[in-house]
């Protein structure tokens, strides 16, 4: 299969020329895909193209979409969760999170996840495979078509560990930036932190994108190594002090501050002593802490930290000179919130 989604204008012009068409036919395909974001992804429907050209493209296996719709769930707050199927019959989920002025797409980078974080539903069924850039981009089109508005912001916080799929991730970011016209500064890549991958991410970003202007969000979730290992098994391979050092280097390499995600778990990491430890870890370099309320999943017994503890924790970080914010959960009533995405449609 040859997917047209993710192709540049030049790529599409060359395809047109290869079929004996004028270069502007490639530009027409580009406009049909990216400018109109057409709901109908069938090449037969690109009526501006000659019928014989459309037939040849279709016969030769060209497609605009590799995903198909399974189901959707609309939460009370307007958040939309989509369950989509791949051509090899795997399932992925993505989420559209609307506000008055924004539509944020929460995208998956893999089918499942190998990291097995104890608080997250995605990793409970393991990793099936990584997604291609075209499959990542297709999620945007599905969200836009279902919500009838254009996506303005992207967060790679869906299923999978993006840093274990770096090249396809960056190819999708290039298209999001150049073709979907979404600034890199409106894109966030979330990672649980994989050894040696932060330096690779910055290096490959400069090679593929020419720069590195997106936000890197590291799922830290603990203020010390012992606690982190209890909730993130992969932490045994990457000490927290090394994560911080590599984060500092990422800031030097890119000029972009790093965001640290911190999931507040009652009795695990939500005490003031943890806030002080975290402050000592992060003091002195360009970073930001994002506190997150825990979203319940069936398989584990973690509990959400109280709002009082969260507020005290936030105040202590702020008083210690750490830039901190609190991210409210969206889509909780439809299992569309952070940590609740799965590979299948169970727990409806």
Swiss-Prot record:
[4Fe-4S] cluster binds at residues 113, 117, 120. S-adenosyl-L-methionine binds at residues 160-161, 190, 219-221, 295. GO terms for biological process: rRNA base methylation; tRNA methylation. Residues 99-333 form the Radical SAM core domain. Keywords: 4Fe-4S, Cytoplasm, Disulfide bond, Iron, Iron-sulfur, Metal-binding, Methyltransferase, rRNA processing, S-adenosyl-L-methionine, Transferase, tRNA processing. Its EC number is 2.1.1.192. The active site is at 93 (proton acceptor), 338 (s-methylcysteine intermediate). GO terms for molecular function: 4 iron, 4 sulfur cluster binding; metal ion binding; rRNA (adenine(2503)-C2-)-methyltransferase activity; rRNA binding; tRNA (adenine(37)-C2)-methyltransferase activity; tRNA binding. It is found in: Cytoplasm. It catalyses: adenosine(2503) in 23S rRNA + 2 reduced [2Fe-2S]-[ferredoxin] + 2 S-adenosyl-L-methionine = 2-methyladenosine(2503) in 23S rRNA + 5'-deoxyadenosine + L-methionine + 2 oxidized [2Fe-2S]-[ferredoxin] + S-adenosyl-L-homocysteine; adenosine(37) in tRNA + 2 reduced [2Fe-2S]-[ferredoxin] + 2 S-adenosyl-L-methionine = 2-methyladenosine(37) in tRNA + 5'-deoxyadenosine + L-methionine + 2 oxidized [2Fe-2S]-[ferredoxin] + S-adenosyl-L-homocysteine. Reaction proceeds by a ping-pong mechanism involving intermediate methylation of a conserved cysteine residue. Belongs to the radical SAM superfamily. RlmN family. Specifically methylates position 2 of adenine 2503 in 23S rRNA and position 2 of adenine 37 in tRNAs. This is Probable dual-specificity RNA methyltransferase RlmN.
């Amino acid at each position: 299969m040859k997917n047209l989604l993710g192709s540049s204008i030049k790529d599409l012009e060359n395809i047109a020329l290869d079929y004996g068409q004028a270069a502007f036919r490639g530009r027409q395909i580009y406009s049909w895909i990216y400018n109109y974001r057409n709901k109908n992804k069938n090449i037969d429907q690109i009526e501006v193209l000659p019928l014989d050209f459309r037939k040849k493209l279709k016969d030769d296996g060209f497609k605009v979409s590799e995903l198909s719709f399974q189901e959707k769930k609309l939460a009370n707050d307007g958040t939309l969760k989509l369950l989509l199927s791949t051509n090899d019959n795997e399932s992925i989920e993505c989420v559209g999170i609307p506000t008055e002025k924004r539509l944020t797409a929460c995208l998956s980078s893999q089918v499942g996840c190998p990291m097995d974080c104890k608080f997250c539903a995605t990793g409970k069924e393991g990793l099936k495979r990584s997604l291609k850039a075209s499959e990542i981009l297709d999620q945007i089109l599905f969200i836009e078509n279902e919500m009838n508005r254009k996506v303005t912001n992207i967060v790679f916080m869906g299923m999978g560990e993006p840093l274990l799929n770096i090249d396809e991730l960056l190819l999708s970011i290039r298209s999001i930036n150049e073709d979907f016209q979404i600034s890199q500064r409106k894109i966030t890549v979330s990672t649980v932190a994989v050894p040696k991958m932060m330096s690779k991410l910055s290096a490959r970003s400069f090679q593929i994108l020419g720069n590195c202007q997106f936000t890197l969000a590291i799922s830290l979730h603990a203020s010390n190594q012992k606690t982190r290992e209890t909730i993130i098994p992969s932490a045994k391979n990457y000490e927290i002090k090394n994560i911080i050092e590599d984060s500092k280097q990422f800031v030097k390499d890119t000029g972009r501050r790093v965001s640290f995600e911190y999931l507040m778990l009652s009795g695990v990491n939500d005490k003031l002593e943890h806030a002080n430890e975290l402050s000592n870890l992060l003091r002195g370099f360009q970073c930001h802490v994002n506190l997150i309320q825990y979203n319940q999943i069936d398989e584990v017994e973690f509990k959400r930290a109280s709002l009082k503890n969260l507020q005290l924790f936030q105040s202590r970080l702020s008083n210690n000179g750490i830039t901190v914010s609190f991210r409210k959960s969206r889509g909780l009533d439809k299992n569309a919130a952070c940590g609740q995405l799965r590979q299948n449609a169970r727990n409806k």
